[in-house]
């Protein structure tokens, strides 16, 4: 069931990351591990890094939603709707509150998925796919909101690798970013969490799916260049995972 977390919430998502992390260490023990997360995944990898940064060597945060002050309202609505309609209820109210602003920002394009990508072909593929653009369940939204809470909860961050490279990349026209000030705040939050090597890069003209934009090769090249430049070694702590 797309958009349903079966009651596992954010903890289940983070457990999945832990399992994959462990498997990668076992299969490729001599290679460094780079944790890359896009969109909701960017919240998940930060929530995971909050307690397990010693089990990775670099963190790349792509297309990250900025901290939303309306999150508590979303949590309250999701809990209320879940109580009344059940956890599998698909909330069009929360969907409108969460993504309505994204759609309105590009309403002149007359396509409700234009905020996804400036590349019209990619945006159309998104619209045509049954695996994209589905409405989350209340259960799914609760997981999303919890991941956002943990990702930005720098006061409870357990930074054990202050020199670990952290890279933020986003489209300059990505509405999930809200604005440049919010993007800069997200970058600064990671510094406040204890990391010394945090960089942020915005791509003009690109929207949320920068990995699918017409000039996507530039994004791939920049990320690959960043990884090679850092010459990271493998994480020393494997047994915790």
Each model region followed by its residue ranges:
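Catalytic active-site module of serine/aspartate enzymes centered on a nucleophile-bearing elbow/loop
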Residues: 193, 197-234
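Conserved small/polar residues in nucleotide/adenosyl-binding loops
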Residues: 235-241
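Conserved acidic catalytic loop of the alpha/beta-hydrolase fold
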Residues: 14-31
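Short beta-strand/loop motif that positions the catalytic acidic residue
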Residues: 168-170
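Alpha/beta-hydrolase-fold enzymes
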Residues: 45-131
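Conserved alpha/beta-hydrolase "acid-adjacent" motif
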Residues: 175-185
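Gly/Ala-rich beta-loop-alpha elbow adjacent to hydrolase catalytic centers
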Residues: 36-41, 45
